[in-house]
UniProtKB/Swiss-Prot annotation:
UniProt: NAD(+) binding residues: 10-15, 99-101, 122-125
Binding site residues for NADP(+): 37
Record flagged with keyword NAD: yes
Name under which the protein is recorded: 4-hydroxy-tetrahydrodipicolinate reductase
Superkingdom of this protein's organism: Bacteria
Membership in a protein family: Belongs to the DapB family.
A molecular function GO annotation: 4-hydroxy-tetrahydrodipicolinate reductase
PANTHER family: 4-HYDROXY-TETRAHYDRODIPICOLINATE REDUCTASE 1, CHLOROPLASTIC-RELATED, DIHYDRODIPICOLINATE REDUCTASE
Annotated gene: dapB
C-alpha cells in the first residue's frame, strides 16, 4: 500500500506535534516534511527525535520544499501563513487542509484564492463537533420559538472570542432558523446589547485553566431547556480528525470544501 505523503506547517507547535505523532503511526500516511519559521534552532534536525516519535524527515524552513515533497499539506498556524500556503499550494498544485482560526481567517473568501486545488478549511476537525452542528441546525429549525444560547469554556491563553467552534455552532443554528448569520449574533456585555430577539443567538465566553475546551448549545423556552454539549477529553482528537480529513481531501477534485462535505461523502 502506498502511503500518502503529508507535510505539516508549524510542525513543532502543540497541534503540529500531535499531527506528527498521529501520522507517523498511521498505515495510510507518512510525514513527508515539517516546516518551522526561518531561524528556528531545530532546522535540519530529525523531526522524530525532536517530537519523540518514529519520523526520519528533517525539519525545514522552506515552504516550497515542503510542498514539493508532499502529496498534501496541513497547516494550523495563523492567517498570514495560511495565505502563504494557499499561494504555494496553487503554484505547486497540491491539496491544502487548514485549521487556522481567528477573525482574519473567518473573514477570508477562499473562493477568491482557490482555483486549481482541493482545499478544506475548518475551525474544528472533530467529527463530534461537526455532528453536533448538524443536530443544532435541526433543533433550531424544529424549535423555532426557543431562545438559543451558546456557551464556551477555553484555556486562558486562547486569543479569539467567540471561538471558531462556537461560530460553527452559531452558523448551524442560524441556518436552521433561515436567518443571516451576521444578523444572528448577540454577544453579552457589548455596548450594542439590547433586548434579545428570538432569532438572535447569544454567546457567552469563559476562559481559565491551561487545557480546556467545552461547548454548550442551549435551546430555552418558558417551560424547558434542551442542552447539547461537547467536551474535548484528549487533544489528540484534532490530529485524528485532521488525518482523516486529509486522506479524504487528497482524492477530491479542485474546489473549496468543508467538514460537512467530507462527512456527507462518507455517510
Amino acid at each position: 500500500m502506498t502511503r500518502v505523503n503529508i507535510g505539516i506547517v508549524g510542525c513543532l507547535g502543540k497541534q503540529g506535534r500531535r499531527l506528527v505523532s498521529e501520522i507517523s503511526a498511521s498505515p495510510y500516511a507518512q510525514v513527508s516534511g515539517g516546516l518551522v519559521r526561518s531561524g528556528n534552532p531545530h532546522v535540519g534536525q530529525i523531526l522524530g527525535e525532536v517530537v519523540g516519535c518514529d519520523c526520519s524527515v528533517k525539519i525545514t524552513d522552506s515552504l516550497e520544499h515542503l510542498f514539493e515533497t508532499s502529496d498534501i499539506v496541513i497547516e494550523f498556524t495563523n492567517p498570514d501563513m495560511l495565505l502563504e500556503c494557499i499561494k504555494m499550494a496553487e503554484q505547486k498544485k497540491k491539496p491544502l487542509l487548514s485549521g487556522t482560526t481567528g477573525p482574519a481567517a473567518t473573514e477570508m473568501v477562499f473562493e477568491d484564492y482557490i482555483k486549481s486545488i482541493p482545499f478544506l478549511w475548518t475551525t474544528n476537525v472533530s467529527f463530534g463537533v461537526n455532528i453536533l452542528a448538524k443536530l443544532v441546525q435541526e433543533a433550531a429549525k424544529k424549535l423555532f420559538d426557543y431562545d438559543i444560547e451558546i456557551w464556551e469554556m477555553h484555556h486562558r491563553y486562547k486569543k479569539d472570542s467567540p471561538s471558531g467552534t462556537s461560530l460553527i455552532l452559531g452558523k448551524a443554528a442560524a441556518k436552521g432558523r433561515n436567518v443571516p448569520f451576521q444578523m444572528a449574533q448577540y454577544v453579552r456585555g457589548t455596548p450594542q446589547e439590547a433586548r434579545k430577539d428570538v432569532n438572535t443567538i447569544g454567546y457567552s465566553v469563559s476562559r481559565g485553566g491551561a487545557d480546556l475546551s467545552d461547548h454548550r448549545v442551549m435551546f430555552v423556552s418558558d417551560e424547558e431547556m434542551i442542552d447539547f454539549n461537547h467536551r474535548t477529553l484528549n487533544k489528540n482528537l484534532y490530529a485524528k480528525g485532521a488525518l482523516k480529513a486529509a486522506l479524504w481531501l487528497v482524492k477530491q477534485p479542485p474546489g473549496v470544501y468543508t467538514m460537512s462535505d467530507m462527512m456527507a461523502a462518507v455517510e
